[in-house]
Amino acid sequence: LFLTRSIEAHVTNSYPVLCRQDGWYNSSTVRELIRQSDQVWVASAWQAWDAALLPESLANLRREFGDKFVIFGTKDFGIIDIKKLLATPVPQRYQTQNQISETSRQINRQLAQAVGTTHFVDVSDLICGASGRGCRVFTPDGRLLSYDGGHLTVEGARELGSSLVDVPAIKNALSF
């Protein structure tokens, strides 16, 4: 977050490192890289409290660096239970779908509303689909998408990368 005030009051005891790392945008190297960039992708494991602060942060970033920021939503591919998956017969295994938490969906809706669809990428929707019915666990060729429900495997990252070219926020940057 690029704020002119401390976020310490918002950070829970489980995230003390955030307070110590607050101010990353004050690095002259980071600021120069942002200035030189045509587009900057901002990704985080967003929580409700920092998603609520994003509009203020984004306004500060735009004022300082211009309108070049694309916000990537929080990722949630459900709970991945490797032992359970391995115990599932192969044909059924590849049909497995997980539920995405309503909290994650709500945070992504909040982010999309705050920044607009031209500056937002809903990663969960790209991987899982916008239906909300569930999120597949495997790629079409049987490779695991995520090993922990929040981080992509190499195969999952490839699949996400191939779908990014059709996202308006990314497509516009690729057309220059």
PLM region spans:
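Extracellular glycan-modifying ectodomains
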Residues: L1-F176
